[in-house]
């Protein structure tokens, strides 16, 4: 696997092989990645009277979360030990012969804010806004602003195009074409349906 350079990223964007929309300015394209901006919708867990979340539970996990939209110019405050779901402003299409990785920007990491807990991998064929699993592991609350560059997308080549890319009818592509933060759909995983 090879990581795409800024030159190749620009070529693929011009050809439409990679789609990042909107790409507000060329400064988002870094030497080997593309800076992604924070969207304006967030989901956080509600305080509920339940001892734990069971992925096999028929109750929808979405019921344990509440959504909010942050108006332009205002901030979403993430407190220490808090977790929130958000998305990038940009809608992304990854071709069948590339994968992408979400990496936090070091400027955010130095504040104690991570942009993905475990799902930093974007499959070939994915299309939609990238989900961010934001955590504050620092000691102070941090203000996050919609439109702020918070992470970067790194593209890597594959040895061959995927035979069954994300979104293929034979795949269980639970988050294809998502536009806003989506709660976990883990209960749809085939091994939990048995």
UniProtKB/Swiss-Prot annotation:
Pfam families: DCD. Bifunctional enzyme that catalyzes both the deamination of dCTP to dUTP and the hydrolysis of dUTP to dUMP without releasing the toxic dUTP intermediate. The gene is dcd. The record marks 120-121 as: Important for bifunctional activity. CDD domains: trimeric_dUTPase. SUPFAM superfamilies: dUTPase-like. The active site is at 133 (proton donor/acceptor). Pathway: Pyrimidine metabolism; dUMP biosynthesis; dUMP from dCTP: step 1/1. One of its GO terms (biological process) is dUTP biosynthetic process. Homotrimer. DCTP binds at residues 105-110, 123, 131-133, 152, 166, 174, 178. One of its GO terms (molecular function) is dCTP deaminase (dUMP-forming) activity. The lineage of its organism: Archaea, Methanobacteriati, Methanobacteriota, Methanomada group, Methanobacteria. InterPro entries: dCTP_deaminase (IPR011962), dUTPase-like_sf (IPR036157), dUTPase_trimeric (IPR033704). It catalyses: dCTP + 2 H2O = dUMP + NH4(+) + diphosphate. Its EC number is 3.5.4.30. Belongs to the dCTP deaminase family. This is dCTP deaminase, dUMP-forming. Gene3D superfamilies: 2.70.40.10. Keywords: Hydrolase, Nucleotide metabolism, Nucleotide-binding.
């Amino acid at each position: 696997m090879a990581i795409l350079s800024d030159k190749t990223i620009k070529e693929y964007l011009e050809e439409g092989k990679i789609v990042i929309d909107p790409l507000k300015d060329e400064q988002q394209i870094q030497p080997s990645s593309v800076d992604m901006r924070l969207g304006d919708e967030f989901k956080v867990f509600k305080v509920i009277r339940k001892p734990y979340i069971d992925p096999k539970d028929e109750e929808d996990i979405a019921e344990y979360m509440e959504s909010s939209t942050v108006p332009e110019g205002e901030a979403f405050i993430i407190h220490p030990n808090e977790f929130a779901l958000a998305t990038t402003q940009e809608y992304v299409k990854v071709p069948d012969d590339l994968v992408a990785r979400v990496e936090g920007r070091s400027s955010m990491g130095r504040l104690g804010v991570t942009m993905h807990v475990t799902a930093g991998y974007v499959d070939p064929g994915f299309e939609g806004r990238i989900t961010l699993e934001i955590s504050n592991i620092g000691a102070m609350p941090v203000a996050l602003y919609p439109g702020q560059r918070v992470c970067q997308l790194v593209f890597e080549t594959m040895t061959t195009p995927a035979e069954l890319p994300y979104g293929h009818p034979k795949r269980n592509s639970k988050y294809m074409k998502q536009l806003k933060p989506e709660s976990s759909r883990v209960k749809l995983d085939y091994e939990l349906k048995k």
